[in-house]
Amino acid sequence: MQVILLDKIGNLGSLGDTVNVKSGYARNFLIPQGKAVMATKGNVEMFEARRAELEAKVAEQLASAEARAEKVNALEAVVIASKAGDEGKLFGSIGTRDIADAITAAGVEVVKSEVRLPEGALRTTGEFEISVQLHSEVFATVKLQVVAE
């Protein structure tokens, strides 16, 4: 299925690219989230008419993400207290929602889908470097300290 991208999508393309994707991916993800439209003649003409407006919107989103990244990078260590055993093993785990809530409480608005935990949830106490993806091109890192209550 041919679609026109309205946003930069990793491993697919950037704004204005016409790409061929599987129909389920287009119908269930790209089109409902407003990241693409079907590549019909009418949509191609409409896109070309709105191209400058869409490019300005994408540039504005990128600028706001970069400003948020500076705030996240400026944070000192974010501390999360959790119940833990004698050897520093947590009762339960700390996931993306807990980290996003802690960063938001520290003063920078972050949602859980922006927090990246490649090794999965944190299950021990200690210091961790957490990556936050605020935009497809903008990453920030924050130091996270997990301490026992």
From Swiss-Prot:
For this protein, the record's Pfam families field holds:
Ribosomal_L9_C, Ribosomal_L9_N
Please give the Gene3D superfamilies that the UniProt record associates with this protein. Answer: Ribosomal protein L9, C-terminal domain, Ribosomal protein L9, N-terminal domain
Q: Name one GO biological process term.
A: translation
Q: Which GO terms describe its molecular function?
A: rRNA binding; structural constituent of ribosome
Q: Keywords in UniProt for this one? A: Ribonucleoprotein, Ribosomal protein, RNA-binding, rRNA-binding
The lineage's top-level taxon is Bacteria
Q: Does the keyword Ribosomal protein apply?
A: yes
Kindly list the GO CC terms recorded for this protein.
Answer: ribonucleoprotein complex; ribosome
**InterPro entries noted in UniProt:** Ribosomal_bL9 (IPR000244), Ribosomal_bL9/RNase_H1_N (IPR009027), Ribosomal_bL9_bac/chp (IPR020594), Ribosomal_bL9_C (IPR020069), Ribosomal_bL9_C_sf (IPR036791), Ribosomal_bL9_N (IPR020070), Ribosomal_bL9_N_sf (IPR036935)
Write out the function statement from the record. Answer: Binds to the 23S rRNA.
Give the HAMAP family listed for this entry: Ribosomal_bL9
Give the family from UniProt: Belongs to the bacterial ribosomal protein bL9 family.
What is the recorded name of this protein?
Large ribosomal subunit protein bL9
The record lists the lineage as: Bacteria, Pseudomonadati, Pseudomonadota, Gammaproteobacteria, Vibrionales
